[in-house]
Curated annotation (Swiss-Prot):
Record Gene3D superfamilies: 2.40.10.170, Bovine Mitochondrial F1-atpase, Atp Synthase Beta Chain, Chain D, domain 3, P-loop containing nucleotide triphosphate hydrolases
GO cellular component assignments: plasma membrane; proton-transporting ATP synthase complex
Species annotation: Syntrophus aciditrophicus (strain SB)
Chain's gene name: atpD
UniProt similarity note: Belongs to the ATPase alpha/beta chains family.
Lineage start: Bacteria, Pseudomonadati, Thermodesulfobacteriota, Syntrophia, Syntrophales
Topological relation to the membrane, as annotated: Peripheral membrane protein
Protein name: ATP synthase subunit beta
Subunit (UniProt): F-type ATPases have 2 components, CF(1) - the catalytic core - and CF(0) - the membrane proton channel. CF(1) has five subunits: alpha(3), beta(3), gamma(1), delta(1), epsilon(1). CF(0) has three main subunits: a(1), b(2) and c(9-12). The alpha and beta chains form an alternating ring which encloses part of the gamma chain. CF(1) is attached to CF(0) by a central stalk formed by the gamma and epsilon chains, while a peripheral stalk is formed by the delta and b chains.
Function: Produces ATP from ADP in the presence of a proton gradient across the membrane. The catalytic sites are hosted primarily by the beta subunits.
């Protein structure tokens, strides 16, 4: 066992000196016994980040460094951080180094995997396209998810990213029935607890592994927890040949933690203070999320947008890796339309007649055209009022307002707050509903009948109730 000594501790950065010729490799895990964490041996894992010269290595800690002193021994494990993987992890909550944090005892996993791995080669990747049904109208119609693809949920603070993601977990895990891996990266611990309890109640937890590195963790843990979750997902894909769902909330915190670590390591900051290696760090993570000839990983990632600015380097770099982007908009949330998806800003690579069929594609495009016309007319309406519009424009506005309201939907995961039961709407029902609105079949119904309903039949029922009143 190669043993060094701590020579310096600055927050989560630890310098360790080793004997001549005994330096551990970059990314190796080094263990230290920190009495502040608990009574166990080797309870603090640090990762080698730099070789400084004079046999010194600089490491980033995965847990608190309070209680460490100079001169303490540090053991080189000779390998990167390895975590337990496989069926034994299902139904459990792990931290960045694979230790359980749910109080249900140790994980007796037969297999372990390093968190740093190469992305699959060109030849191993699978490029066939299949649509994944989510049961959320606005997403299934306008931003269809590809199975084995990567989707991003973009939005500022409080636009509803986490709620949309929790609904996805509920709907896809319930109806798709595959294995899910959830990475909680630098988000609120309360939300992580909510998700766990919800999964326990619904029974989905039996098919899910939760990997948490929440806001309270040091930057080293937040920068690595998504890699731990990815290793768990890769095992199910590569070894067990499964189709895996990977949920990451929030990928921005991965970037944010990377920028903290980068500053601590003394690297020059780049644009807006981010790390100079922003594109590389994100690329190494995203390229591992892919479908191979053995199985697939379908990823849904929340992306926090600082100050609602989509040109910020973190969200802008993330855009390049995704097959589709669901943009959550504050003005739409202000109208009370949830999910607050912007139907004109959101895009999907597979919104294509070859993949979706001619009818779905035409309806989706017609919905976008109608909403765009309404958006263009809003200035005229604000200045001159509705009466100055032509009859054709009045009809467009009338239908657009119905479409806008019909894009809202009650969620299962929000039922406890709204008092309205959630609705799962199949893709054919979604397409039919919007097609009939566009054809003018419901021009005589009041627009409020279309707000917060599931299928179109429910809107018709609601309209009847309004008429009876």
């Amino acid at each position: 066992m190669n043993i060094g000594r701590i020579v310096q501790v600055i927050g989560p950065v630890i310098d360790v000196v080793f004997e001549e010729g005994q330096l551990p490799a970059i990314l190796n895990a080094i263990t230290i016994t920190n009495p502040v964490i608990n009574d166990e041996e080797d309870n603090l894992i640090v990762e080698v980040a730099q070789h400084l010269g004079d046999n010194n290595v600089r490491c980033i800690a995965m847990d608190v460094t309070d209680g460490l002193v100079r001169g303490m021994p540090a053991k080189d494990t000779g390998a990167p951080i390895t975590v337990p993987v496989g069926k034994e992890c299902l139904g459990r909550i792990l931290n960045v180094v694979g230790k359980p944090v749910d109080g249900l005892g140790p994980i007796e996993a037969k297999n372990t995997m390093p968190i740093h791995r190469e992305a699959p080669s060109f030849l191993e990747q699978d490029t066939s396209v299949h649509v994944l049904e989510t049961g959320v109208k606005v997403i299934d119609l306008l931003v269809p998810f590809p199975r084995g693809g990567k989707m991003g949920l973009f939005g500022g603070a409080g636009c509803g990213k986490t709620v949309v993601m929790m609904e996805m977990i509920h709907n896809i895990a319930m109806h798709h029935g595959g294995i899910s891996v959830f990475a909680g990266v630098g988000e609120r611990t309360r939300e992580g607890n909510d998700l766990y309890r919800e999964m326990l109640e619904s029974g989905v937890i039996k098919q899910a592994a939760l990997i948490y590195g929440q806001m309270t963790e040091p930057p080293g843990a937040r920068a690595r927890v998504s890699l731990t979750a990815l290793a768990a997902a890769e095992y199910f894909r590569d070894v067990e040949g499964q189709d895996v769902l990977l949920f990451v909330d929030n990928i921005f915190r991965f970037t944010q933690a990377g920028s903290e670590v980068s500053a601590l390591l003394g690297r020059m900051p780049s644009a807006v203070g981010y790390q100079p290696t922003l594109a590389t760090d994100l690329g190494e993570l995203q390229e591992r999320i892919t479908s191979t000839d053995k199985g697939s990983i379908t990823a849904v990632q929340c992306v926090y947008v600082p100050a609602d600015d989509l040109t910020d380097p973190a969200p802008a770099t993330t855009f390049a890796h995704l097959d589709g982007t669901v943009v959550l908009s504050r003005p739409i949330a202000e109208l009370g339309i949830y999910p607050a998806v912007d139907p004109l800003d959101s895009t999907s690579r597979i919104l294509d007649p070859i993949v979706l069929g001619e009818e779905h594609y035409k309806v989706a495009r017609a919905v976008q055209v109608t909403l765009q016309k309404y958006k263009d007319l809003q200035d005229i309406i604000a200045i001159l009022g509705m009466d100055e519009l032509s009859e054709e424009d009045k009809l467009t506005v009338n239908r657009a307002r119905k479409i806008q309201r019909f894009l809202s939907q009650p969620f299962f995961v929000a039922a406890q707050f709204t008092g309205v039961d959630g609705k799962f709407v199949s893709v054919p029902d979604t397409v039919r509903g919007f097609k009939e609105i566009l054809e003018g079949k419901y021009d005589d119904l009041p627009e409020q009948a279309f707000y917060m309903v599931g299928g179109i039949e429910e809107a018709v029922e609601k309209a009847k109730k309004y008429q009876e009143q």
